[in-house]
Design a protein with these regions (language model features):
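Glycine-centered hinge/linker elements that transmit conformational signals in sensory
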Residues: 176-207, 246
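Long, aromatic- and glycine/proline-rich binding clefts that accommodate carbohydrate-like moieties
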Residues: 291-344, 348, 373, 377-380
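Conserved N-terminal structural module of periplasmic/extracytoplasmic solute-binding proteins
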Residues: 1-65, 366-380
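Short helices/loops that flank or line small-molecule/ion binding pockets
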Residues: 44-55, 124-125, 143-144, 207-220, ...
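Hinge/lid segment of periplasmic solute-binding proteins
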Residues: 66-117
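A ligand-binding cleft/hinge motif common to bilobed small-molecule-binding domains
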Residues: 64-70, 215, 223-239
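Extracytoplasmic/periplasmic substrate-recognition and gating elements
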Residues: 234-296
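Extracytoplasmic/periplasmic solute-binding protein
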Residues: 107-109, 137-179, 220
């Protein structure tokens, strides 16, 4: 009996389609057992990766870890045939496929695709007119909503504050300066304007908490930037959300998220794990049971599928333009260290507790230290 253990993050978007795959996949592969455990969203995005690779065959993780994974040889590269590689390249949602590649090897498969998008309560927004298409239109919506005792929403916990800065700051990665000072000052100014019109609990929110609040209360009309979660677009016996492209002509700035699935080099069943990962990421499974079980597929075929969009209230079609042009964070070793150290500073700046110029100095100094010096944190 071959037993595979996998590690997901603790949201139905991740574990739902993984749990649903166990029965049919094991039935088609006698002698195989599969078990999925879960960890928090924070641990998925910023927690230590090294220790979990000793306990699991498969891990679902965030793509900025790729540089450290490749440098340390922590995962088994997917040595695919030319035909398989072309298939994944054609089926990539935006830069999802590219985000798990480094040094000429593919270290994970894109099992889930996401980026920062806009969202709203259709029943609340209808009284205010069409969707805003620019920063100024979002501010006008926020002012009008505030007069009615309603708010914008904006996830502002440190992780999301940093992601917002990357979306609006136009990073350029030219060696010594990650984001130009004037771009940081402009982005901080815009985000402070949005924060002033956002729900008072926004500093406590990640996207999940924001969306949970939106479906449980009637006081948040619109969110201009947050990582999309298809689960909140399914109609049910509760208010539901609709999702849209971000309200900026420079939609290329929207930060790419999503998740990859990789195989630990410490796995005793590497080929079985690779085969299972290929099944989970196949277009056939992704546009069928994967999305029906609450997943957000990493397959372009699924995003463009008519039935998938009918099931999800048009979530994928309504945000495809943004994710196709989304910004791919660096994947060099040390980037997770940079991000983790900078996130609290970004949150402080958006809260008005740190000057934008000082934020620029800190971010670029930490970038130089982690990019060219000795990282202060590692995946191990």
């Amino acid at each position: 009996m071959t037993r595979l253990r996998g590690l997901a993050w603790d949201h139905r978007r991740c574990w739902g389609p993984l749990d649903a795959s166990i029965g049919p996949y094991c039935a088609a592969n006698p002698g195989l057992e599969i078990e999925w455990d879960r960890r928090s969203l924070y641990e998925f995005g910023e927690g230590a990766l090294g220790p979990v690779l000793g306990a699991y065959d498969l891990v679902v993780f965030d793509h900025p870890f790729i540089g450290d994974i490749a440098e340390g040889g922590l995962m088994v590269p997917f040595d695919l045939s030319a035909e398989q590689r072309r298939g994944f390249e054609r089926d990539s949602v935006g830069a999802s496929w590219q985000s798990y590649a480094r040094d000429g090897r593919q270290w994970a498969l894109p099992i889930d695709a996401a980026c920062q998008v806009a969202s709203y309560r259709p029943d609340l927004l209808e009284r205010y007119g069409p969707l805003p298409r620019s920063h100024d239109e979002v501010l006008e919506l926020g002012r009008r909503a505030l007069k009615d005792g309603k708010w914008l929403g904006l996830p502002l916990v440190p992780t999301d504050a940093m992601c917002l800065l990357l979306t609006l700051g136009e990073p350029r990665e030219d060696g010594d300066e990650f984001i130009a000072r004037e771009k940081i000052e402009q982005a901080v100014g815009q985000l402070r304007q949005l924060a002033a019109l956002s729900h008072p609990d926004s500093p406590k929110w990640n996207p999940i908490r924001c969306y949970d609040h939106m479906i449980a209360h009637d006081d948040v009309v619109y969110v201009p930037f947050a990582f999309g979660y298809v689960n909140y677009a399914f109609k049910a016996d509760r208010p539901y959300l609709r999702f849209a492209d971000v309200p900026t002509p420079r939609s290329a700035g929207a930060l790419l998220g999503g998740a990859g699935i990789g195989v630990s080099t410490q796995s005793q069943h590497k080929q079985a794990a690779i085969d299972y990962a290929l099944f989970l990421c196949s277009p056939g499974y992704q546009r069928d049971d994967y999305v029906k079980s609450g997943g957000q597929p990493g397959s372009l075929a699924a995003w463009q599928d008519t039935e998938v969009n009918a099931l999800s209230g048009g979530f994928f079609a309504s945000t495809l333009a943004t994710i196709e042009a989304s910004y791919l964070r660096p994947t060099h070793p040390g980037f997770i260290s940079f991000f983790r150290q900078c996130a609290p500073h970004a949150a402080a700046a958006l809260a008005g507790e740190l000057q934008a110029a000082e934020l620029a100095d800190r971010l670029n100094r930490i970038y130089r230290e982690t990019r060219h010096g000795q990282p202060q944190w590692s995946v191990a």
